[in-house]
Amino acid sequence: MAQDYILPYIDVMKTDLQPGIIRVRTYVTTLEMRARQLATDIFSTPAMIGLMEGTCVELTGPYLDENEQTVGTHVDVRHMAPTKIGQSVTVKAELLEVKGNKLRYSVTASNDEGKKIGDGLHRRAVINTMRFGKS
């Protein structure tokens, strides 16, 4: 059963952080991103998720105040097709929902052949870095 976790309250978050904001970023896959357990150089699921999370962070960053950051709270992603190391991967993140300090995103990834390789949902929470972890 899913459970909501209460994260530290934040004082201020810029009000222009609204659903519908989109960030698209293209990355070149590297050997560090490969699925090491395979004999071939194939882009790994953890690396894809990392790029998706990073794109969400970049999308949200300009809307945060100086002492704010986001932390990941949930990932629900499908990795649907292989991508060879060296290919480009384009990640699209769209902010779907803002509820207090909780953010929900749609994420997709496609390779440079235009093939969709992954999609899903990601959740993050805005935290005050001056107070986070100091309870």
Features from the language model and the residues they span:
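Catalytic strand-loop segment that frames the active site of acyl-thioester-processing enzymes
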Residues: L7-S44
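HotDog/MaoC-like acyl-thioester-processing domains
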Residues: P19, I85, L95-S135
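Hydrophobic beta-strand-centered segment that forms part of the acyl-chain substrate-binding groove
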Residues: V57-T90
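A cross-taxon signal for low-complexity, glycine/charged-rich
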Residues: M1-D4
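Conserved N-terminal beta-strand and adjoining loop/helix that marks the start
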Residues: T45-I49
